[in-house]
Amino acid sequence: MANLGCWMLFLFVATWSDLGLCKKRPKPGGWNTGGSRYPGQGSPGGNRYPPQGGGWGQPHGGGWGQPHGGGWGQPHGGGWGQPHGGGWGQGGGTHSQWNKPSKPKTNMKHVAGAAAAGAVVGGLGGYMLGSAMSRPLIHFGNDYEDRYYRENMYRYPNQVYYRPVDQYNNQNNFVHDCVNITIKQHTVTTTTKGENFTETDVKMMERVVEQMCITQYEKESQAYYQRGSSMVLFSSPPVILLISFLIFLIVG
């Protein structure tokens, strides 16, 4: 890790040092810096054009037929058909704004979808609701239960409730807590709708939810370790020195 940081520091120093020097070099003069050829600017060779006020028929420097510097047919500098500088069909005030675009409406389906996965569920003491999963194909050892599961699997949960993995000592504790809270919440919600579960249903739900909780644990553990690795990388001294040097080049 230290060697990688040193090589990164060397490459960025070599690249940004040239950029830092370029920023401090004086810039040469622009186009026609030796003097202006237009009136009133004192070029060495004299002006090639006489002092100009307005154009033809311009008493105050406006365009053709412009008494006060507006566009064609504009007495006071507004757009076409604008007597006092407003937009088309506007008298310069805040009224007549029928052409103003309306504000976009918030799509509530998108808001609900964003809050569905990984959101903290209110009233459950810090539990989060995982993303929807495909129900696993499980064999229960006999044809009757296998057929019963295939016919009723849609009645079982496809999402699990869980807490962050750093609150548990091992996978077993995470899975045990995940199974209990998920089955409890699903049973209460379904019973409220007038549907009851048999002992066979509860047995199958335990197997299904256990598999989904294991999958959720593996997913959360991987994300947790990736976040930890990123923190270790950015907290190493070579990377801190590199970031400080880049900030110095940008600000300086």
From Swiss-Prot:
Keyword Ion transport applies: no
Binding site for Cu(2+) 1: 60-62
Top-level taxonomic group: Eukaryota
Residues listed as glycosylation sites in the UniProt record: 180, 196
Signal peptide: 1-22
Location in or out of the cell: Cell membrane; Golgi apparatus
Keyword set, alphabetical order: Amyloid, Cell membrane, Copper, Disulfide bond, Glycoprotein, Golgi apparatus, GPI-anchor, Lipoprotein, Membrane, Metal-binding, Prion, Repeat, Signal, Zinc
InterPro entries associated with the record: Prion, Prion/Doppel_b-ribbon_dom_sf, Prion/Doppel_prot_b-ribbon_dom, Prion_copper_b_octapeptide, Prion_N
Predominant localisation class: membrane
Sequence repeats: 51-58, 59-66, 67-74, 75-82, 83-90
Region named 5 X 8 AA tandem repeats of P-H-G-G-G-W-G-Q: 51-90
Protein residues bound to Cu(2+) 2: 68-70
Coiled coil: none
Region called Interaction with ADGRG6, residue ranges: 23-38
Ranges of biased composition (kind: Gly residues): 52-94
GO cellular component: Golgi apparatus; plasma membrane; side of membrane
Positions of the pro-segment in this chain: 230-252
Lipid modification (GPI-anchor amidated serine), residues: 229
Disulfide cysteine pairs (residue numbers): 178-213
Sites where the protein binds Cu(2+) 4: 84-86
Binding-site list for Cu(2+) 3: 76-78
Free-text domain note: The normal, monomeric form has a mainly alpha-helical structure. The disease-associated, protease-resistant form forms amyloid fibrils containing a cross-beta spine, formed by a steric zipper of superposed beta-strands. Disease mutations may favor intermolecular contacts via short beta strands, and may thereby trigger oligomerization. Contains an N-terminal region composed of octamer repeats. At low copper concentrations, the sidechains of His residues from three or four repeats contribute to the binding of a single copper ion. Alternatively, a copper ion can be bound by interaction with the sidechain and backbone amide nitrogen of a single His residue. The observed copper binding stoichiometry suggests that two repeat regions cooperate to stabilize the binding of a single copper ion. At higher copper concentrations, each octamer can bind one copper ion by interactions with the His sidechain and Gly backbone atoms.
Protein name, per record: Major prion protein
